[in-house]
Every structure is written in structure tokens, then in C-alpha cells.
Amino acid sequence: MCICVNCDLLVFCSLYQTIEILHKESLSFELDQIVEFEPRKSNIIVNINSSENSIKHEWDVISCESFVLNLSKYNVS
């Protein structure tokens, strides 16, 4: 699982924005309202799952020096 969902800097992070775009998900915030920053020393794992008819990719940040814990940042409805 991507650690970004528990990071207090999630809405400012350029890496998280890129990962959401790669996942083809709608951003939970407006890009034009964000001051971007580049996180330090982030590590990403890419999982590739294939079946007969498709190939799916999953991008997960597993470590990041810029990470600031906030367990209530990401709400799943």
C-alpha cells in the first residue's frame, strides 16, 4: 500500500499527483490551487499484474524522507 495516503503533505506533493495520474484516478484536490514540492528520497514499487486480456500497473510509494504522518488525512467514503 502507498504510504502517501497517511502523509500530511499529500496535497502538496508532486510525486503523489503523478501517481494519481498514473492510476487514472481523479485527484481529490485542484491542481491549480497547490504549491508543489518534490519529496526527498522516495522509493516506489511498481507491481505489474497481467491476465489474458489486460495488464494492470500499481504504483506504491514505500518510503519517503519527506513523509509526515497524519492518520486522518485520507478519508475513504
UniProtKB/Swiss-Prot annotation:
Assigned keywords, A-Z: Cyanelle, Plastid
Name of the protein in its database record: Uncharacterized protein ycf34
Source organism of the structure: Cyanophora paradoxa
Pfam families in the cross-refs: Ycf34
A Gene Ontology cellular-component term: cyanelle
Compartments in which it is found: Plastid, Cyanelle
